[in-house]
Amino acid sequence: QVTLYNYLKTRMGTKWVLHFDDEIFLTSINKAKWNIYAVALQDLIFYSLSYLKVFHNYQETDKANGIYEEILDKETKNGMPKEIILLAKEKFTERLKKIDWNIYYKSWPFNESALTLYEWAPIAEELKSLDRKIVLNSMILKWDNIKDEFAKLIKI
């Protein structure tokens, strides 16, 4: 979400807060936020379980779907739209069928969420196309920080 808001702020300039009075724009941001969150959560679960399997002999990767669904089901309390939850669960199931737990953690594990940020950001397509590389790299760099924190936390 932070990356989405920073991207919007950068693209809109100093008057970006004025757009928060626009209900249509707010609806777009909210939809983008939840779609990005859903895929980022998928990436994080896949990364975490893959990393734990490889480096800590974690054998319960079959719990991935249950973990994801439990988190999303709780997000309805925070306003996550049910239709986004249903689509996200379907996408998770499809991705889960293809995952190789032994290599996921090292094979562009957060690429899907970076692409989702790019896809859902409510920015004009002609401007977005100019920003593609910057947006994707920005998201990947943010995830690098998370990966470092995760590695430190599990060593404690």
Go through the PLM ranges and name each one.
Residues 1-24, 67, 116-119:
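Amphipathic alpha-helical segments in structured regions that serve as interaction surfaces
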Residues 27-32, 65-79:
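Eukaryote-specific, cytoplasm-facing alpha-helical/coiled-coil scaffolding segments in long proteins
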Residues 73-156:
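Helix-driven interaction modules
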